[in-house]
């Protein structure tokens, strides 16, 4: 699973998440409410509408924001940084100091003070791509970090669903994979996602093992200690502490985590 893994490193104090293999995938499906507006604090492609007062570009409205984030989620690396905000009327009241802090945030991977702004009422700050050890991870702030782990739940469930859809040919001369129609797998339960959240404080890697070790009626992920290093190759499995096994049972349609 050299290039097929998920890396997560969270800071429980600042609610910042550094991830590889998740990023903005399923963000708009996971959050309870899609943001009203986005302020683009780093915008190399000049996307959105230009605001004369703050000199930033913005994206307005739930549907426009949803389309923007979903499009960004499909990029391998994202160079646009953004922060959400509730009301344009409060956005227009930003002080020079607050605008300076937003400019600083756009040029760095860390806020000058906090990644929250009272006048914006933001729930998220998307820092874009960072490169620890030359690996393109995504860094993001969540007011409620459980929003990220709901995203992770969708990523894990989709991985299992896609694996079930791919029916390998029984004979070598049949090289074409047959795609089956299967029901979408549910995401793991809240207690399991909360447990993964706690483990991620130390940095974790999640690998997909499929049915190799558990039989045809189950699919397995393994969770390893990774600390602050997103690099992970097959040989690292013998070197890293195994936190546990996350399995999905096709018969009962349930998830289970065993340490």
Residue ranges and their predicted role:
Residues 1-259:
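Structured alpha/beta or helical-core interaction and ligand-binding surfaces enriched in interleaved
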């Amino acid at each position: 699973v050299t290039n097929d893994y998920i890396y997560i490193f969270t800071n429980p104090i600042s609610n910042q998440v550094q991830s590889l293999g998740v990023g903005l995938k399923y963000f708009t499906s996971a959050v309870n409410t899609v943001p009203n507006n986005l302020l683009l604090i780093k915008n190399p492609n000049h996307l959105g509408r230009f605001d004369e007062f703050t000199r930033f570009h913005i994206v307005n409205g739930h549907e426009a924001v949803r389309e923007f984030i979903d499009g960004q989620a499909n990029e391998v690396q994202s160079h646009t940084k953004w922060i959400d905000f509730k009301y344009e009327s409060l956005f227009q009241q930003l002080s020079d100091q607050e605008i300076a802090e937003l400019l600083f945030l756009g040029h760095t991977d860390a806020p000058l003070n906090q990644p929250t702004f009272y006048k914006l009422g933001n729930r998220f700050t998307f820092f874009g791509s960072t490169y620890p050890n030359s690996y393109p991870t995504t860094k993001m702030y969540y007011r409620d970090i459980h929003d990220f782990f709901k995203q992770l739940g969708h990523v894990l469930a989709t991985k299992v669903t896609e694996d079930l859809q791919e029916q390998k040919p029984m004979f070598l001369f049949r090289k074409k994979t047959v795609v089956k129609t299967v029901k979408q797998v549910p995401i793991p339960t809240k207690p399991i996602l909360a447990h993964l959240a706690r483990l991620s404080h130390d940095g974790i890697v999640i690998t997909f093992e499929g049915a190799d070790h558990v039989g045809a009626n189950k699919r397995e992920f393994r969770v390893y200690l990774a600390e602050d290093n997103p690099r992970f190759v097959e040989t690292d499995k013998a070197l890293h502490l195994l936190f546990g096994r996350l399995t999905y049972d096709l018969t009962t349609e349930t998830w289970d985590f065993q340490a």
